[in-house]
């Protein structure tokens, strides 16, 4: 049975009714739950299994029965490991019903359906007693309740409740404890994700300066989770060694504190600005701390030397440490970075956590009182994503737009309409002397931020437009330029910004014949690649540590077919990929004739050996009709693609990715099709792999 859902179309900008199966939300939740990523984490699986074997063997040797509680069992993999390791009884709980039902079938398929008691509820709702959920307390808890911040999924409260209500006084836990680490760093590149810089002209003079409220804003305390190992080596400087800041003892019977703070005195290893805190954690899975799993970036990983010695030749050193996307590293931005003038200079790092999150500050003097969690006071951080803030600061990108604007804006004569959200570059046309600039800014917070920049820079003749259809005919006929980056807050995939074309068509008949439209064209490109790891988020598991998980694969595949787009957005700079061919154009859109439909097909010859486990897609925006590379702004590779080599991707935008259902390492070609219906806002791609 199907139903209709109200869905925003990013290309048309309109809400529409879409027919979907009535269990669409269920399938979407299953497909995006992320269990597959964890099951491909070989180190996690092997070390959990080793810890279970060691712990259960030790309990047996001490003459103890072993009654295991598995909180958040997922596929049931840890419960099955516990049984195989010799547990007397295993109780598994899972509140996500689709996953719980799948686990029940997996237990049966693996011959343990009658040996695991499955409870379909949260652990905090479980009751102990005769005829209740569990007949007795467990004396071994195994769980994976962690995220990038360690505590973001509620681990503190869940462990506190488990020890109080579900576990014996002498219960052991896997993992036994966790340690959190911080390392202070400076990075002009990474700091672009956090604050707005001066926008200079091509001659280096300041065109737009951020107002005082932006400069004084402390930003958001929230983590920026990234694959820290993929930050280019020359783009950051480590100012300290990694330091342990907090421990979380999962085995302790006493309650784990929900709020803690710690002030650490540090010495700078080299001069610099203490702009960033790099953060990660490790877990000791057994009581003795012998089985260690670290989420450290490669340069701080305790097993780097051993892993490097056994790595494949083509794998970069940054990728020798075990890959995982469910536990990454994080960047925290220091509100007011202190300048460390010399190596050896003392400074202080203030570390804090509440029940679900962490935050940091750095200062030259010890603070007299508790450092409060900081929040955005300038609209920038609460309105735009980290990648968008970085994009606004991207020098090469900005120069290409300014090259066009400085060449075409005639002071006191040009009348400019700017389409998009937070278009600082369009605003720059006012600083270049345009007679009038009208900014399409329907978003309240974005408009408020832009207006603060207008006021601070004393720009004249700037107006705001909430709805382009409200523009007077006399205003439209006077326009000399319609300009966009384009960027819209609702956009997820690069071509979602084709909304620029939709807005343009609403005005087309009233615009002067010689109006300058920029960008004038957009081209979508595709590149077959071999990912080192990213494909695992959609790849089937098959078996894991000897357990058959094909039922899980089938469930996820069924849901993905109904609820996952054939192309999804990913920040590809974080996920190394090797080009298997030259990029090929799939679509060219002329914005002056945006409403034209396109139905295209072709094929891409794979010129390199390897497994084509992904197809990357992006948009090139052509600012004018010259085809000059300096007039093209790409959302794809930041350097020329060389087949067989790793691709360097733009770090301030997400690209599109298609994951083939059945990747092949056979040489051949990728057949593709493109179907674009602009009036309906439909842009669909099809891909299939063919042998030569």
Curated annotation (Swiss-Prot):
SUPFAM superfamilies: S-adenosyl-L-methionine-dependent methyltransferases
Cystine connections: none
Entry's Gene Ontology molecular function annotations: histone methyltransferase activity; protein-arginine omega-N symmetric methyltransferase activity
Pfam families linked: PrmA, PRMT_C
Keyword Cell division listed: no
Record-annotated SAM-dependent MTase PRMT-type domain positions: 14-359, 368-692
Organism domain of life: Eukaryota
This protein's UniProt keywords: Methyltransferase, Repeat, S-adenosyl-L-methionine, Transferase
EC number: 2.1.1.-
InterPro entries from the UniProt entry: Arg_MeTrfase, MeTrfase_PRMT7, PRMT_dom, SAM-dependent_MTases_sf
Biological-process GO terms, alphabetical: peptidyl-arginine methylation
PANTHER family associated with the record: PROTEIN ARGININE N-METHYLTRANSFERASE, PROTEIN ARGININE N-METHYLTRANSFERASE 7
Family stated for the protein in its record: Belongs to the class I-like SAM-binding methyltransferase superfamily. Protein arginine N-methyltransferase family. PRMT7 subfamily.
Function recorded in the entry: Essential arginine methyltransferase that can both catalyze the formation of omega-N monomethylarginine (MMA) and symmetrical dimethylarginine (sDMA). Specifically mediates the symmetrical dimethylation of arginine residues in the small nuclear ribonucleoproteins SmD1 and SmD3.
Descriptive protein name: Protein arginine N-methyltransferase 7
Encoding gene (name): Art7
